Amino acid sequence: MIIDVNTPISSRLDKYLKRLYPLLTQGVIEKALRQKQITVNSQKAEASLRVKGGDKIFINDKFNLPVKQPEKLVFTDAEIKLAKKITTDYLIYEDDNLIAINKPAGLATQGGSKINLSIDSALKYLNYKGADFKLVHRLDKETSGLLLIAKNYLSNVKLHDAFKEKLVVKTYFAVTYGKPIKNVGEVRSNIEKSKGSTPKITDIYSENGKLAITYYKLLKSLDNNLFLIEFTPVTGRMHQLRLHAKLLGCPIVGDDKYGNKEIMPYSKYMFLHANNICLSEKIFGKEINLEAKLPFYFTDKFVEC
């Protein structure tokens, strides 16, 4: 029996086989590989070998494959189109461990009760086709910019640990209405999030909420009391930058949750963009510095870059 690998993204051989035959156990796969009952491109292979489109998996006719096939999942045309964009149009970096994309504003990272299309749902389609993508972190739906996606389980674990250990530095650009009193500074607050409610600032000494820390720097004065500010979050609380911008007295333009009526004329988009991510060499053995191009509404209306 010959299986033509048709995944657009490389996948571990054992994981690829398990998707095709869910009843196959790891032990059975590894034994079959040792005995050359399963080979790849007519060569002996390890379970960790990454297979990709064009590879051929040879399975000895005497090997008893479980007959149960995986559940047939149904994906929408929109999810399939988005999956293609993730691996082409939105893609700005790829290696063996991760991909980085420039997420457009208006596209949700994860699904929800009122969300029919998301990055996560498109990744499920790619995974169904043999990839092993896992979301590492999230961006708000109306926030654009850099989003990291792990390509396998081990990379996902390493990246999650890296975020906890502060080995990942993220910077954001925002256009705000008004500016902070100081051009450079730090914001500290507690942010409380109850189930089903909007996050809110609580007193720094309160037992409610979790500590949130953000560094900021004024980059440029624009017209109409608008300013370009760089934010660097130290912690990763929900809506942290939006809440801290409001706390500084300079809400982000287009923020319909924490903004005000004075900035409504500019509010077709929320002007918050994840511009840069730097991964320490301690994570994958090399420093990775990524930058996502500003969306057109930044460059066309406010910022010359």
UniProtKB/Swiss-Prot annotation:
It is an enzyme of class 5 (isomerase). Pfam families: PseudoU_synth_2, S4. The active site is at D140. It catalyses: uridine(955/2504/2580) in 23S rRNA = pseudouridine(955/2504/2580) in 23S rRNA. Residues 11-70 form the S4 RNA-binding domain. One of its GO terms (biological process) is enzyme-directed rRNA pseudouridine synthesis. It comes from Rickettsia felis (strain ATCC VR-1525 / URRWXCal2). SUPFAM superfamilies: Alpha-L RNA-binding motif, Pseudouridine synthase. It comes from the Bacteria. Keywords: Isomerase, RNA-binding, rRNA processing. GO terms for molecular function: 23S rRNA pseudouridine(955/2504/2580) synthase activity; RNA binding. Its EC number is 5.4.99.24. Responsible for synthesis of pseudouridine from uracil at positions 955, 2504 and 2580 in 23S ribosomal RNA. This is Ribosomal large subunit pseudouridine synthase C. Belongs to the pseudouridine synthase RluA family. SMART domains: S4.
